Amino acid sequence: MSIVPKETVEVIAQSIGITNLLPEAALMLAPDVEYRVREIMQEAIKCMRHSKRTTLTASDVDGALNLRNVEPIYGFASGGPFRFRKAIGHRDLFYTDDREVDFKDVIEAPLPKAPLDTEIVCHWLAIEGVQPAIPENAPLEVIRAPAETKIHEQKDGPLIDVRLPVKHVLSRELQLYFQKIAELAMSKSNPPLYKEALVSLASDSGLHPLVPYFTNFIADEVSNGLNDFRLLFNLMHIVRSLLQNPHIHIEPYLHQLMPSVVTCLVSRKLGNRFADNHWELRDFAANLVSLICKRYGTVYITLQSRLTRTLVNALLDPKKALTQHYGAIQGLAALGHTVVRLLILSNLEPYLSLLEPELNAEKQKNQMKIYEAWRVYGALLRAAGLCIHGRLKIFPPLPSPSPSFLHKGKGKGKIISTDPHKRKLSVDSSENQSPQKRLITMDGPDGVHSQDQSGSAPMQVDNPVENDNPPQNSVQPSSSEQASDANESESRNGKVKESGRSRAITMKAILDQIWKDDLDSGRLLVKLHELYGDRILPFIPSTEMSVFL
């Protein structure tokens, strides 16, 4: 017997317009209706379980109907419970209480808000143990540890370990230390005490918790105090002390320190008084830039490339002030001779042509502009001079051979070329002479006697001259022994020749590179002398000066 009565089938038939349904037909349709309802409900329960829910909804039934290729029932998508009312005049007849909706109200109703797009937003949970006060982070007052009594009361349920966020709490001593350093940097009233504070800042081992506070303090004061020259100098001294402290791990804070240092290097104006020596501040900042790149350039590979790009853009921009050009030149010069040779000397001639009108007192009437131009000119001269000085020191000129060597070489030696086809040593000597030393020299460019960089004398090889006639009392070997000895001597001679050939090729390549670099240095020296005249001569060492003159 079906749980669906035949009266239900008759009511459903009447609701769809079938009025002549026989009772026998309704009785036979009831079991089939029950089977179909059970089938749909089983599929709906599967949809509910796949959705990780325990409450069956109308959407689950719609999903089950779609799986059975049956058109879903419309008008029952509400998430709330259905309300049924009893039909008047019928004891067991119920219907859903549908609220009548006017089309005018539906049309005039405002549109709902568009749903937000799915996105991922990153924010800091904690910075150096301190939770930032941003809307994404819950305030610390809301998260509290549960009371011990409540934990003991919940013996049946699982215990939950609530961990509070780590709060970065500075000790009272560190707070006073930071405040004192900041006051000394701002007040500038006690220079001896400030120097002692800088020494402590560069050597104390317990100052790492203060590094984020110092970096923020330096960044804020540099951006707001460009007119205070003494404050900027004090801040740069703090940066140097932090860099010199071996107990501070400052790599994560370089991205905050570098903008402040570069600002003090290439800013248009530092200080608001004529007596402020901002040139010294720029030199100090250039030394800091060099220190940072040398110490942390291997850790941050893009650090020096980004810095040089910034400095080159400041140098080659004609709209920048001469003070900015000076800072860029000092910063590039502090990065080494290679940077100077590639970035400054390659642009030296066109830049000097643009700087020349500023150096002329007849064309430039502003004395301050003339002074700034001469400062830039001096910075370029110093950078180029130190570059050529270091270049010439790497490749010193070869000393001339001694007179005794030249005198002996007239009768006893020859200059041997490094050509692979000319590897044998020839010695012009009489057969009755005792064993002697043969001189081996290698030809450099233009027929000059080439030696190693250390300037040592030509290499000497002891090779005794063998007599053609053996002694009378010597024992003559057999024919087989003579053949084996001949083979061994030939193999040894072949190995010696191969090793000598490889050494000669290597020496030739080294000497060719040395002569090429030396020739480039000579050309560079001539070019700098054409641009600067006799002003470049004090940077040339005395030995190279004599060769150049």
Swiss-Prot record:
Compositional bias annotation for Polar residues: 427-436
Region of interest (Disordered), ranges: 399-501
Subcellular location: Nucleus
Pfam families recorded: TAF (PF02969), TAF6_C (PF07571)
SS bond partners: none
Quaternary organization: Component of the TFIID complex. TFIID is composed of TATA binding protein (TBP) and a number of TBP-associated factors (TAFs) whose MWs range from 14-217 kDa.
Name recorded for this polypeptide: Transcription initiation factor TFIID subunit 6
Species annotation: Arabidopsis thaliana (Mouse-ear cress)
Organism taxonomic ancestry: Eukaryota, Viridiplantae, Streptophyta, Embryophyta, Tracheophyta
